[in-house]
Regions:
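N-terminal non-catalytic cap/leader segment that marks the start of a structured domain
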Residues: 1-57, 150-152, 158, 164, ...
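Residue-level recognition of short, solvent-exposed, well-ordered loop/turn junctions
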Residues: 30, 37, 84-86, 192, ...
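Catalytic-pocket segment enriched in acidic/His residues
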Residues: 45, 51-53, 121-234
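Structural signature of FAD isoalloxazine-binding scaffolds in flavoprotein oxidoreductases
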Residues: 53-70, 85, 215-219
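A structural-propensity feature for long, helix-poor, extended segments
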Residues: 70-90
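N-terminal accessory regions of nucleic-acid-interacting proteins
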Residues: 98-112
Length: 236
């Protein structure tokens, strides 16, 4: 067991060891500031939803209250009848970043983890902007860990619902690569340590409902698994 804030102090060992099957994994990062998503960053995904391929990164925000960890339920709000999974590679920022060039963008990255950009698809169509559709509580599962020694440029991204393969893409098919996205964002905003960037989902998104389990696997980053539950059945 380690105790620290990874952004402001070195990790300290407590000397305690716990069996993996006796602990509950939390989200590996809870952003103090923001989660930023990149929409339609795979051409095949843009086409499957009937959208044009963007000419510059299409970005949106998710609040930090949307973040949950491995094994935690995706809680379906009553306002939506069409909820979708979206498997994504997440980038965790290591230090303050402003006006970053693509050439040095990777020096601002702490590491990478898996993400599920859960979306209320019907609300997304109704609202025209995405705050409610992508910002509801539990709409951003992250985990199971942050990998700091990692090459994200040719990585397989897959998702399953109840064991059935739904998505199978690769980061080499990004429209906008990670350095381009970081440079684009920092032209107008400051990224802070612990900020998370969701880099887009490949084709194959679809509906989930209460009782399903969604598994997200990204090469080298383990499996992020979350059950899907009706919000009315969960007492907070």
């Amino acid at each position: 067991v380690l105790s620290s804030d990874p952004f402001f102090s070195p990790a300290q060992s407590t000397g305690e060891r716990l069996p993996y099957d006796e602990v509950r994994m939390l989200a590996p990062i809870l952003p103090r500031s923001k989660v930023i998503g990149v929409g339609r960053n795979f051409a095949d995904h843009a086409r499957e939803l009937g959208n044009d391929v963007p000419v510059s990164p299409l970005t949106f925000f998710k609040p930090n209250t949307s973040v949950v960890g491995p094994g935690e339920p995706i809680r379906l709000p009553a306002i939506s009848e069409e909820v979708s999974y979206e498997a994504e590679l997440a980038v965790v920022i290591s230090k303050i970043a402003k006006n970053v060039t693509p050439e040095n963008a990777y020096s601002y990255v702490l590491g990478y983890t898996a993400a599920n950009d859960v979306t209320l698809r019907d609300i997304q169509r109704i609202d025209k902007q995405w705050s409610r559709a992508k910002g509801f509580d539990s709409s951003c599962p992250l985990g199971p860990w942050i990998e700091t020694e990692y090459d994200p440029e040719n990585v397989r991204i897959r998702s399953w619902v109840d064991g059935e393969l739904k998505q199978d893409g690769n980061t080499e098919d990004f429209i906008f690569d990670i350095p381009t996205v970081i440079a684009h964002l920092t032209e107008v905003m400051t990224l802070l340590p612990g900020d998370v960037i969701l880099t887009g989902t490949p084709a194959g998104v679809g509906r989930i409902e209460a009782g399903n389990r969604v598994d997200i696997a990204i090469d080298g980053l383990g499996v992020l698994s979350n059950p899907v539950m009706d919000l009315s059945l969960i007492h907070i």
